[in-house]
Curated annotation (Swiss-Prot):
The gene is ackA. InterPro entries: Ac/propionate_kinase (IPR004372), Aliphatic_acid_kin_short-chain (IPR000890), Aliphatic_acid_kinase_CS (IPR023865), ATPase_NBD (IPR043129). Belongs to the acetokinase family. One of its GO terms (biological process) is acetate metabolic process. GO terms for cellular component: cytoplasm. GO terms for molecular function: acetate kinase activity; ATP binding; magnesium ion binding. Mg(2+) binds at residues 8, 383. It comes from Enterococcus faecalis (strain ATCC 700802 / V583). This is Acetate kinase.
């Protein structure tokens, strides 16, 4: 049996999971943090609750990869490098170019780097991870799995913005979405849990974490999603504003004395959302829920819930119906009250949540009542498994 490693490389981190394929068993997983900084943190979890952790300076991603592979051998998790038969890499932006996962060639890598303008915080880091593994394991197949690929099935009327069409034709200015690998996994898993072909289902998937997005999945294909040209659009998030009137930017820039539009975008990305609405209290939903006695925190919570309901309601219209609503990611999987508050405001189209079934954290469950016309599901996301599956598919 082959071993496949799924990689999520950040600018100063490397998150990974090692799978025994094709039986999809997680052999080990871990993260390298603070790459390029002093006191990098190197962690491997394996076996029956065993953990290896060391703090050491790690200069770059290639050093991190070499250290990871050597330590997997030292811990007898790998016998040699040769046991790894595939490496899958998360890549945030694939633009219109990549409609599916793809084997990474030099040409593909160049295109990934060229698409960095669509994801300047992510694609360059993803490319660093790819280069590091290809240098150390040059003969092993590498596969890029794009966050945006799942959304390339959106019809034109759902991905175009109402600006001059030439901006799309010249500059590819359009909605791309994000979290596609997560939405793909949980929609497929929901269909399996319901025992119905995904081709026959209309599903709304709610990926609710510090970043959050809602997707309409019709017959297994994404037909609309809340994130846009970048992951800044859509619902209210931990630190991101979600949808705002574009005219707000120049107005606030004038009031704040800003001259660089990127400074304003940074505020919308990093200082807004729940964090901004609570005057800097927190971007963490757990902190929000424990401070609902504060009026501004209650309002922030209400806005968070309201925006999600609005997107769900609009996607019922987009698909002319819905069979199931799925909750996933950190908030979606663990915040019992958030799920209840979202659904309690949407009983008008046949959603009924079962309070006992909903009292669950981080595990698969059908949480709707037996009489609910719309099935409600909790499905923990597993983007790493989807990456490993795509590597197997493309070998």
């Amino acid at each position: 049996m082959s071993k496949t490693i799924a990689i999520n490389a950040g600018s100063s981190s490397l998150k990974w999971q090692l799978y025994q394929m094709p039986n999809e068993e997680v052999i080990a997983k871990g993260i390298v943090e603070r790459i390029g900084l002093k006191d990098s943190i190197f962690t491997i979890k394996y076996g029956e609750g065993q953990k290896y952790e060391v703090i050491v300076d790690i200069d770059n991603h290639e050093v991190a990869v070499k250290m990871l592979l050597d330590q997997l051998i030292d811990l007898n998790i790998l016998g040699s490098y040769d046991e790894i038969t595939g490496v899958g890499h998360r890549v945030v932006a694939g633009g219109e170019e990549f409609k599916d996962s793809v084997v990474i060639t030099d040409e593909v890598l160049e295109k990934i780097e060229a698409l960095s303008e669509l994801a300047p915080l992510h694609n360059p880091a993803n490319a660093m991870g790819i280069k590091a593994f290809k240098h150390i394991l040059p003969e092993i197949i590498s596969v890029a799995v794009f966050d945006t690929s799942f959304h390339t099935t959106m019809p034109e009327h759902n991905y175009l913005y109402s600006v001059p069409r030439e901006y799309y034709e010249k500059f590819a200015a359009r909605k791309y979405g994000a979290h596609g690998t997560s939405h793909r996994y949980v929609s497929q898993r929901a269909a399996e849990m319901l025992g119905r072909p995904i081709e026959d289902l209309k599903i709304i998937t709610c990926h609710l974490g510090n970043g959050a997005s809602i997707t309409a999945v019709d017959g297994g294909k994404s037909v609309d999603t809340s994130m846009g040209f970048t992951p800044l659009a859509g619902v209210t998030m931990g630190t991101r504003s979600g949808d705002v009137d574009a005219s707000l930017l120049p107005y606030l820039m004038t009031k704040l004395g800003l001259t660089d539009v990127q400074d304003m975008v940074d505020i919308l990305n990093k200082k807004s959302g729940l964090l901004g609405l609570t005057n800097g209290l927190s971007s963490d939903m757990r902190d929000i829920q424990s401070n609902l006695d504060k009026p501004e925190v209650q309002t922030a919570y209400n806005i968070f819930i309201d925006r999600i309901r609005k997107y769900i309601g609009s996607y019922v219209t987009v698909m002319n119906g819905v069979d199931a609503i799925v909750f996933t990611a950190g908030i979606g999987e663990n915040a019992v009250g958030v799920r209840k508050d979202i659904i309690d405001g949407m009983t008008w189209f046949g959603c009924e949540i079962d309070d006992d079934k909903n009292n669950v954290h981080g595990e698969e469950a059908v949480i709707s009542t037996d009489d609910s016309k719309i099935k409600l599901l909790l499905v923990p996301t597993d983007e790493e498994l989807m990456i490993a599956r795509d590597v197997e598919r493309l070998k």
